[in-house]
Amino acid sequence: MKTVSTAVVLAAAAVSLTGCATESSRSLEVEKVASYNTQYHGVRTPISVGTFDNRSSFQKGIFSDGEDRLGSQAKTILVTHLQQTNRFNVLNRTNLNALKQESGISGKAHNLKGADYVVTGDVTEFGRRDVGDHQLFGILGRGKSQIAYAKVALNIVNVNTSEIVYSAQGAGEYALSNREIIGFGGTSGYDATLNGKVLDLAIREAVNSLVQAVDNGAWQPNR
């Protein structure tokens, strides 16, 4: 009888534990360029975004499938940050077929606007590394950091002359750390989101540099 009672208690405990799953969510603030929501009284220059290629050695090993995911991700980030600067009219060239189809459905002429400049970009450096340390040969604890680094280059090309009229670069580093002390503490696996975070940071820095050039006259788009 005692054995049966113990089994019932254990079963009830197991059910209660399996029923304690929790779900949580929270919104996160998204980093924006420095000029976001700032006043600007100048002319907003029409620009489009051209190619954005991964020129680094990242994801280019013998097992790579040849698809430039890093460059594609970088281009999406660049378009967003350029639009948020309030200094340019960013023209979408990625979805021309869909836009043409919708204009045909609505019966309106597809009247595209031309760009004065094309922005091209390259991921010139990108890398990931793990850094670890031990305290008293690991007895007192150990730590590990995942570090991602990125550097990008932007070139502004005049569509009429093919002249590169201005260039900007940006670089950034992101780190994720965790520490275990005498057997206590969390461990973290490979975090793929660091790639996007550090890429966003580097591109944002390059775009901020571009905006500064417009504001201080180092690059005058309308001349």
UniProtKB/Swiss-Prot annotation:
Cite the positions of S-diacylglycerol cysteine lipidation. Answer: 20
User: Chief location of this protein?
Assistant: membrane
What's the protein's topology in the membrane?
Lipid-anchor
Q: Where is the lipid attached (N-palmitoyl cysteine)?
A: 20
Cellular localization per UniProt: Cell membrane
Q: Which InterPro entries match?
A: Curli_assmbl/transp-comp_CsgG
User: By its UniProt entry, which Pfam families does this protein fall under?
Assistant: CsgG (PF03783)
Q: Which UniProt keywords apply?
A: Cell membrane, Lipoprotein, Membrane, Palmitate, Signal
Leader peptide range in chain numbering: 1-19
- One GO CC term, this protein: outer membrane-bounded periplasmic space
What's the miscellaneous note? Present in outer membrane vesicle formulations which are used as vaccines in human.
Among PANTHER family, the record links this protein to: CURLI PRODUCTION ASSEMBLY/TRANSPORT COMPONENT CSGG (PTHR41164), CURLI PRODUCTION ASSEMBLY_TRANSPORT COMPONENT CSGG (PTHR41164:SF1)
- This chain's protein is named Putative lipoprotein NMB1126/NMB1164
**Could you tell me which species this protein originates from?**
Neisseria meningitidis serogroup B (strain ATCC BAA-335 / MC58)
